[in-house]
Amino acid sequence: MALENPKMHNSEISKRLGAEWKLLSEAEKRPFIDEAKRLRAMHMKEYPNYKYRP
């Protein structure tokens, strides 16, 4: 979406992608959810003492 609309602000891109996400079925969302879980577990293994500090 960012490549198709290079002048669009990030906030607008996020809103549109959020709207698209809400339209997906659970089956369509599942690969993304599973990948997020895999990456989270990998990060926890590689950085066990990591603490989020904004």
From Swiss-Prot:
DNA-binding region: 1-51
Gene Ontology biological process terms from the UniProt entry: brain development; negative regulation of transcription by RNA polymerase II; neuron differentiation
GO molecular function: DNA-binding transcription activator activity, RNA polymerase II-specific; RNA polymerase II cis-regulatory region sequence-specific DNA binding
GO cellular component: nucleus
Keyword tags: DNA-binding, Nucleus
Compartment(s) of residence: Nucleus
Superkingdom: Eukaryota
Disulfide bridge partners, by residue number: none
Protein name: SRY-related protein AMA2
Organism per entry: Alligator mississippiensis (American alligator)
